[in-house]
Design a protein with these regions (language model features):
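Cyclophilin-like peptidyl-prolyl cis-trans isomerases
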Residues: 1-180
């Protein structure tokens, strides 16, 4: 299974991705995590790109690098992956839900897609701080924390203000994809 390390302003979080049970969702996450130099030179259909929601620019860099954990709810989850940091941004496309019977929100450390309804997945994701079974069948689990759950918990304990926004900026500074 593929692992990805999110190097955050609070420390490293390594997640194991469920390539075999959520292949489309994992592929999307990896595409947004990686930098595709070919897309920088020529953003063609065969390159990995996303559209900046603020400028409309087609980009090939990692959407996640520099993105904030923009929503933190104590004992529930930490959410990131929005290039605008507002909770309303995404990669310029949406894709269908990908649920698997044995992948549920049955504990802390589950990596899942954030969405605004059925089949509206894009770039936003969250990591659970506790079991959240009410999210099963609504948000697709596609990985889990392998190392750095203490960092997830530290981010989850960050004081928040209006709209569950952290008072201190919590960033994904860089991303490392550990291919098999």
């Amino acid at each position: 299974m593929t692992q990805v390390t999110l190097h955050t302003s609070a420390g490293d979080i390594t997640v194991e991705l469920f390539d075999d049970r959520a292949p489309r969702t994992v592929e999307n996450f990896l595409n947004l995590a990686r930098h595709d130099p070919a897309a920088d030179a020529d953003p063609a259909p065969d390159t990995v790109t996303w559209e900046d929601p603020e400028t409309g620019e087609v980009r090939g860099d990692s959407l996640y690098e520099g993105a904030e954990f923009h929503r933190i709810i104590e004992d529930f989850m930490i959410q990131g992956g929005d290039p605008t940091g507002t909770g309303r941004g995404g990669p310029g496309y949406e894709f269908d839900d990908e649920f698997h019977d044995d992948l549920g929100h049955d504990g802390a450390g589950k990596l899942s897609m954030a969405n605004s309804g059925p089949d509206t997945n894009g770039s936003q994701f969250f990591i659970t701080l506790d079991a959240q079974p009410h999210l099963d069948g609504k948000h697709a689990v596609f990985g889990e924390v392998a190392e750095g759950m203490d960092v997830v918990e530290d981010i989850g304990a960050t004081p928040t203000g209006r709209g569950d926004e952290p008072l201190d900026e919590m960033l994904v500074e860089s991303v490392t994809v550990h291919d098999d």
